[in-house]
Amino acid sequence: MPSEILLKIFSYLDAVSLLCAGCVSRRFYHLANDNFIWIRIYSTAFSPTRSNWKVNSVEKIAVSVSFLSVQDKEAGYWKKEYITKQIASVKAALADILKPVNPYTGLPVKTKEALRMFGLGWAIILKEKSGKEYIMEHVDLSVNDTSVTVIWYGKNWPCLASLSTLDLCGVTPVFMDWYKTPTKHRLRWHSLIAKYNLSHLTVSTMIGCDRLIRIFCLHPGLLVGVWKKEEELAFVMANLHFHHLVERSTLGSATIPYELPPHSPFLDDSPEYGLHGYQLHVDLHSGGVFYLCGTFRNLFTKKGNIENGHVKLIVIHLKNNREHLPLIGKVGLSWKTDILDGCIKSCSMMDVTLLDEHGKPFWCFSSPVCMRSPATPADGPSFLGQTYSVDYVDAEGRVHVELVWIRETEEYLIVNLVLYLSIAKINRWFGTEY
């Protein structure tokens, strides 16, 4: 068919159909880049009248000049301009929906709505040592109170021994309504969230196992399940905290993560500024089942509790029985693949949201954790039952939990919960010099 006829046909297509047509063949690709077609699509989608603007003479002249200069632009110029504008409009809409903040959690009120409305998803990119890549979109996810758990599984995993790294990316449709009708060739952009080294699947990172699989925890917040018998991948599970999740999943590039905006300290002349007024919300959960959901307000500490670059913030005191909390149900981390499922005892996901005295998120994370034995409470009361501990550590702080298994009631009891906050982070956040 003559190119003139094809161009005439293409001129009746919308942007999505035109992009799909460009994937058919090399000839169609070049024809679908026609600037005259794309400037019409661009002008219709982003015209001043469409945005309820008042069109003045300067704008009219600018539009006319744009049409006259079409031939001066390289092929595909107006297609790129249109896609760039679409991406910018999606980002602007995301920023707008995330403005309202929940005073209880310090997090955006409409995070769940944003995930749904904008078709946000996640993908992992498995890279072989040879350079070959495998892109896998998430199979399942569950939205929790302050995090989302994303799962990948299937039958076509590449050989684990050949893999070097795993990239976790947010995936967003360029056109906001595309996610409603999924297609293999839909136009999307990737935002790198984290990069993991798969050579770190060692004994030191293994946190649990059952008769079928072993699970490994890679920082930040990634859980990798490996079949015991075959020593191959069974599943990958990422637990992502809501704090800046949408921004991290949409505003980065395929190779560079989104960089958080610089924090401006709230200055205060209080002698112990930055050591009081904290609020902690902590969840322990797995598979939609919550073992703990607790909020602790008005937490404080003293300068005398600063040691080894951290300040000790006691949330649950070991010697105060009234503060001790039970975990609800049988603690275990649920997993599944396309053919099997199971539950690994004593493991779960931990979500921590620590707000400063102004109600701003100071330290947030979501990560797999496990209870380890033995861990005898120091200088504490004599408990009847096995003792356990849960520990998490990163560059900004450490969480230490001590638990006791009560045989009579068959439940775990939290008898001590302590946060160790980085003094360097406190000084940066509050402008102090501890």
From Swiss-Prot:
Residues 1-41 form the F-box domain. It holds the Pfam family F-box-like. InterPro entries: F-box-like_dom_sf, F-box_dom. GO terms for cellular component: SCF ubiquitin ligase complex. Keywords: Ubl conjugation pathway. The keyword Protein transport does not apply. It comes from the Eukaryota. Directly interacts with SKP1 and CUL1. Substrate-recognition component of the SCF (SKP1-CUL1-F-box protein)-type E3 ubiquitin ligase complex. PANTHER family: F-BOX ONLY PROTEIN 15 (PTHR46731:SF1). This is F-box only protein 15. It comes from Macaca fascicularis (Crab-eating macaque). The gene is FBXO15.
